[in-house]
Amino acid sequence: MTDVTIKTLAAERQTSVERLVQQFADAGIRKSADDSVSAQEKQTLIDHLNQKNSGPDKLTLQRKTRSTLNIPGTGGKSKSVQIEVRKKRTFVKRDPQEAERLAAEEQAQREAEEQARREAEESAKREAQQKAEREAAEQAKREAAEQAKREAAEKDKVSNQQDDMTKNAQAEKARREQEAAELKRKAEEEARRKLEEEARRVAEEARRMAEENKWTDNAEPTEDSSDYHVTTSQHARQAEDESDREVEGGRGRGRNAKAARPKKGNKHAESKADREEARAAVRGGKGGKRKGSSLQQGFQKPAQAVNRDVVIGETITVGELANKMAVKGSQVIKAMMKLGAMATINQVIDQETAQLVAEEMGHKVILRRENELEEAVMSDRDTGAAAEPRAPVVTIMGHVDHGKTSLLDYIRSTKVASGEAGGITQHIGAYHVETENGMITFLDTPGHAAFTSMRARGAQATDIVVLVVAADDGVMPQTIEAIQHAKAAQVPVVVAVNKIDKPEADPDRVKNELSQYGILPEEWGGESQFVHVSAKAGTGIDELLDAILLQAEVLELKAVRKGMASGAVIESFLDKGRGPVATVLVREGTLHKGDIVLCGFEYGRVRAMRNELGREVLEAGPSIPVEILGLSGVPAAGDEVTVVRDEKKAREVALYRQGKFREVKLARQQKSKLENMFANMTEGEVHEVNIVLKADVQGSVEAISDSLLKLSTDEVKVKIIGSGVGGITETDATLAAASNAILVGFNVRADASARKVIEAESLDLRYYSVIYNLIDEVKAAMSGMLSPELKQQIIGLAEVRDVFKSPKFGAIAGCMVTEGVVKRHNPIRVLRDNVVIYEGELESLRRFKDDVNEVRNGMECGIGVKNYNDVRTGDVIEVFEIIEIQRTIA
């Protein structure tokens, strides 16, 4: 017969080549995919497979037993219960080799048990003997000490009669020695008896353990508890077994009952039902039959708490956690209150809180990962193997108006800065530039304080940070923040000292200020390159590019070019005609048009790709920024973008992420609500400024929301009712009308339907293109809600010279105005020795019997104080007025 190859044989057997090679290897034949197979080798493989697949001979015995049990019922009537017990046993025929192996193992085990038993007996004997010797020695020492004490006492007592009682003392001493010897002999006998009992007990224990571990038959029956199908309770089965034993025992039921009684040494306490059954069996009845036992609950409460393994997912309700720990929900709530958290039984808590509660109650916690589907989708990706050099990703960071975008404009030879509202960057711009020495990808970040998160994302997605510092301005707050972001991301920094062409430029000052924050130039022994540039004149631009490429060579940046792409979302927005648009920076692999991408909570197929110039491209490699269309929604800036194989699985992962994010968010909100419940009860009235915010890109929504929420104070709070990307729609206007909110549009406009609702409801709609103006106007609106500050201003002082009595007003103070003006009906204070003794209102003010409204400095007048008559000569009346000062938010 002609030999065939492994591949041909695999095709004939309809199996894979790798599995066939593995089967040959299991049979002891080493083959590769292209080797030939002889007929003898085929037969060897077939014999191996037959031997492997042939099952051992089995014998299954089934037994079914039916019986009737009479149980006494109420009213003296008995009730018959039909009992059926099914048993199944399977006997497996042992292989001869396996039987020999089991016999050898049994013999070895018997020898080991015998050796252990002998060692245990010898050890017990030695320990008992040593213990007896120690006890005898200690007893002798104690006797000797007592004897010495008694002798000393006797000696002191009879010291004056020593001559007369010498003989008696000697006789007493001999008697005591005899008693000590007798006590020592008794102690040795007691120790020997204890030693024998201990050795006998150890031998009995070893013999019992050996009998328990001994195998009685090579054909071991395997019995599964699940094969019992019992149609009544456990109590009925026990009653049937006891009835069978009594019938077999006949007249000897008294002896059987005595033998069935539990031993005294049993560590488990017998239940009440067991004791009653035992008494009934001893008493018996007519004809040797015992009375039927009463049905009693035989459950015994566990003596100690059971520690369980509690599996906790990312979120869990309090009730589910209590069920997993087998405790009441009230106990879990009590434990949470001890830890300082309030919860209800249906409240969802996060994984960390549940772990603390379970560990506090003494259970072992197993944290379950619920993202197996996500991990499976991520692992099923073709990522390629060979890494190739890639272009560096450079982020330009610095303070506002220090010339970041102008510097990038000169490099790109475009005028993007003129297109930015107010001349400040409000988006992350991603561009790649071709130079003579290679390609560089630039990310331009905003410098305003509101865009902190956008700068942080830029630092995380970058390889090199170019820190732009104006030579005339020096280090500013956002410059320091950019340094912190770069250090947190562990990214090298290249410093571009801009505006070097200005007369007031001072580069040395910039170096000194940056050195305070750990940015040292190379000439000072540091690691950062300093380049002097001018974005207007173009000075030093080539040196800056060379410094960037030099730093990139030092980093040896590489990425896999072939395979499925992955990257990060730099920016995202909603376009009215194109739908959700995301700016993606590819990190590795190649992104093609038509790929299925998973991006945070969103997914979709790439319908179109455009570069930063707006031109259509079919693919994008590492370090290339592109805009992609076709996602299911607007992703959050900073989300990971991953190309996957299956769109259905991508949708499942995205929905799972959305649900999990919602659960965790609700759990945290509920937790904060309950924790702040008492604080909210004690707070006074708090005014709220409700805002519905719409912006052009996701990064702007994020930055504006953070800036507005930071404006909140104890009296006025900013509440973002709704936010999103895209134009203002009718839904947004309806939401603003329902919540009495201000509509804010940042670089977006309202459509026709929204304008109708706004006009009908007279809503406050405001458009902005610069974030400074937006924040200032919201501050002004909040300042209008602040309650004014009340301030007391003293307007006059009058000294009491004399006191007169008036039937109408009581005591009238004759005063001289020493300072300011005294006005009628103003609040006053009466001061005596510079201490306020009364505060009230000026009721009557007269000058020469005429009522006047005010009296000026240096004039005399009569003052009547309302509801106060204890005015004395020498008192000072202080007149003041309360003025309101409008507060503003800083």
From Swiss-Prot:
Residues 45-304 are annotated as: Disordered. Residues 92-217, 267-280 have a biased composition (Basic and acidic residues). Residues 389-558 form the tr-type G domain. Residues 444-447 are annotated as: G3. Residues 398-405 are annotated as: G1. The modification N6-acetyllysine is found at K808. It is found in: Cytoplasm. InterPro entries: DNA-bd_dom_put_sf (IPR009061), EF-G-like_DII (IPR053905), EFTu-like_2 (IPR004161), IF2_assoc_dom_bac (IPR013575), IF2_II (IPR044145), IF2_N (IPR006847), P-loop_NTPase (IPR027417), Small_GTP-bd (IPR005225). Belongs to the TRAFAC class translation factor GTPase superfamily. Classic translation factor GTPase family. IF-2 subfamily. This is Translation initiation factor IF-2. It comes from Escherichia coli (strain SMS-3-5 / SECEC). The gene is infB.
